[in-house]
Amino acid sequence: CGEETALIHSMEGKRGEPTLKPPFPAESGYLGKPTNVNNVETLANIPIILTRGAEWFSTIGTEFSKGTKVFALAGKINNVGLIEVPMGTTLREVIYEIGGGIKGGKKFKAVQTGGPSGGCLTEKHLDTPIDFDNLLAEGSMMGSGGMIVMDEDDCMVSVARFYLDFTVEESCGKCTPCRIGNKRLLEILNKITEGRGSEKDLQTLSTLGQVIKDTALCGLGQTSPNPVLSTLNNFYDEYVKHVREKTCRARQCKSLLTYTINPELCIGCHLCFK
């Protein structure tokens, strides 16, 4: 569980499902008592704030997002690992100065921030200063601090399907928008990556994704369509290629590939059958 009321229910021996708020845990939480639920990263900032003072801490970061942020930098990048940067550092600085650029000299394509429910941002977003408000405004989020870099060999339709598959598995099942709505989104993405999609499906993805964001009960459900909606907004041409021409430019959707065998080079390994 990641949502605060679901965490509390798990601690009480109940099923890990969220509840409507208010009341918030600070008013009625564990065993009905006032309960403070925070991320470990938030709590880790407390000692240095107490030691050096809030005024010193406020000198780091942006106007509305103070301090630093830890990211798990991964993907098609030369330097992977945990990094800590001041709020306001740009995505470009993280990817190219700290991350060392794209692995193998490939072309940058996208960066996904915020974990499985985060959005996929493009080259035009690289100079965006990292803070809570800026990432939300661009269709992504800070989330758990995940940051995955993608290159020209990644298919953004397949990427959206990958993250949504995770969300469907992790849904607690309590609210209908998340339990059923995300399954419908995943079914459509499977159709598209298998060459059975239509342009009508693209409109359905957009409409249904927004409904889920507006009506799901907890943060997981409300943010789960982000990978779909952000890739639709930023890589719409890839979706169109999949549904109109039944082609995947990144050659990641196996159902859209056509294989040929060169008899002169074939060694009979049968790998092409797998």
Give the positions of each predicted feature.
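Hydrophobic alpha-helical positions that pack around
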Residues: C1-M87, G99
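Terminal amphipathic helices with adjacent charged low-complexity linkers/tails
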Residues: K103-E138, N233
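Short amphipathic, charge-patterned alpha-helical segments
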Residues: M87-G104
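Active-site loop ensemble at the mouth of alpha/beta enzyme cores that anchors a bound cofactor
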Residues: S10-P22, K124-M141
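Short, conserved aromatic-histidine micro-motifs
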Residues: K21-I48, Q112-G114, E199-V211, H242-K254
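C-terminal accessory/binding modules appended to enzymatic or scaffolding proteins
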Residues: G67-N79, V85-M87, L91, R249-K274
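Ferredoxin-type iron-sulfur electron-transfer modules in oxidoreductases and energy-metabolism complexes
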Residues: P129-P263
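Extended, hydrophobic alpha-helical segments in both membrane/secreted and soluble proteins
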Residues: L91-V94, K107-F108, S171, R184-L185, ...
